Amino acid sequence: MEEAKKKIQSLIEKYEQVLNSGKIGDYSEQETKNAFITPLFEALGWDISNKDEVSAEESQKSGGRVDYGFYLNGRLVFYLEAKPLKADLEREDFAKQAIRYSWNKGVDYAVLTDFEGLKVFNSQIIEGALMDRRIFEINYKDYINNFERLWLLSKESFQNGLLDKYADEHSKRLKKIPINEKLDKDIQECRKLLTESFRMWNTKEDIDLIDEGAQKLLDRLVFLRVAEDRGIEPHTLKELSRDLGSQREKNKKDVYQALTSKFRELDDIYNSNLFSEHPFEKWEEHNQSTEEIIEILYGKPGYYDYDFSAIPSDVLGGVYENYLGHRLEKSKKGTAVSKDAKKRKEQGIYYTPTFIVDYIVKNALSPILDKCFISALFCHTFSSCQAA
């Protein structure tokens, strides 16, 4: 800690020289990172040169990127969003940028800094104002005077869970709502809304077919949200909902009908069971439940936004397994359950977590692919020699 203080004191003096020279505005974000932010976290014990410990500029498929991800024993512990010297850290969009990505990734903490100031947020708090999510903030002038607080972002601190303890003591973790819990709750709410709406407007349809149709429509909407955020499909769901909803009296076609027409186009594009024709496409739905569900799948403006390109596949897999559990529980109570769900139950077919997939690929496929690569390289070299 004493060695860290010396290094940070040197950075403070360097910053004040730049400040007094009036050249603060000349520093770009990258120059700020190189000259101040990276050395600051190196002083706090992080190995910036080790990509397994600190990743630089993790990209988001929905656009943009996050500056640094900090890992401990392979586990992501916080994301850091860097800004150029003299940036206005009070701007809410800066903080939300860091918080949004961390929350969707299921990471507890988000850090925002331009070196002059530093803010730490609990990204898992989604209710209340932005200040409710802030765990602490500190100005560069207090980096040494209040070093114990700055040290909460050190590698040693995370090894000992010190930031967790600090957040608990200051009641900054009590309202924590992880992405997996929130998404699962919202998906359940969407399923309930759809099922009730279909039952209301299609009284002659079989109840089990109604449930199946509701899940099929929900599957398609989630797929489209993922495709939108990954840049595979344009952002059409919200625009469709808003455009048709705002002109409801003029339009003979509502959002639900427009979507069912769109599904026929998507079936030609993706040629998969997901978009194959289903009876629900000819059902009635006139209480705007589909519009409400689309809004839910985008998140709650000002509190949290779903970014399906950042949400780990484990989260989506867990949500779907919860649905299968729901279906199987209904079967125990005498309600019919789909053959697909029964098959998964009987044969032990469940979603495989990412870390297990990575382990299997690394230990089963990698050795084989390495041999293939070596063989191909040998053949190429041998052929080149023959040609020569």
Report residues per predicted region.
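Extracellular structured ligand-interaction cores
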Residues: 65, 115, 219-221
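Short flexible/disordered coil segments
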Residues: 115-119, 375-378
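Preference for the N-terminal adenyl/adenosyl cofactor-binding alpha/beta module
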Residues: 1-21, 84, 154-388
